[in-house]
Amino acid sequence: LHRAVEHAPDPPGHVARRGIVRSYQISSVFPHLTVIENVRIALQRSTGLSFQFWRSESILDSMNARALELLDQVDLRGFAGVETVSLPYGRKRALEIATTLATEPELMLLDEPTQGMGHEDVARVTDLIKRVAVGRTVLMVEHNMSVVSSIANTITVLARGSVLAEGPYQAVSNNPAVKEAYMGTSETELEGMAH
């Protein structure tokens, strides 16, 4: 439910046009296109140019300025001409965030955005999420507690499909029911349990 509208039965394209975009746990970019070409594809919908099999290069080039702005936001301008397949995983996730930003979303849904990343990429993507969250809502599934503690304003902990606790990180991380459910004892600190 977003803005009092149920979106579950709607096709993804309709949901995206309402300002809701999602990014899956597995990176979904076009591997054999360049970084800027990936962003231009995302921009076609928001600029009124729906994706078609063929577009003249001049029409696509007209989107380069906005595509480069988006790449600046995610620190990928220097990779604009690079084929996406050669990017490290963390940079691919940043590219995916740039493509979601192309739709100018109000609400971003991120599924474990730092899953499978090395420490350097985790820090880079965490910082990126903080920056792009300004002025929009980000709903994120994340199991890395250091990421959660540095990004989230409000945390909701689920156990077996039910809300176990909700609130700021400090309150939730010290909640005995949360500790019991996830650590097996209420004496264990969640703080150091990042993975």
Regions found by a protein language model. Name each.
Residues 1-195:
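Glycine-rich phosphate-binding loops of nucleotide-dependent enzymes
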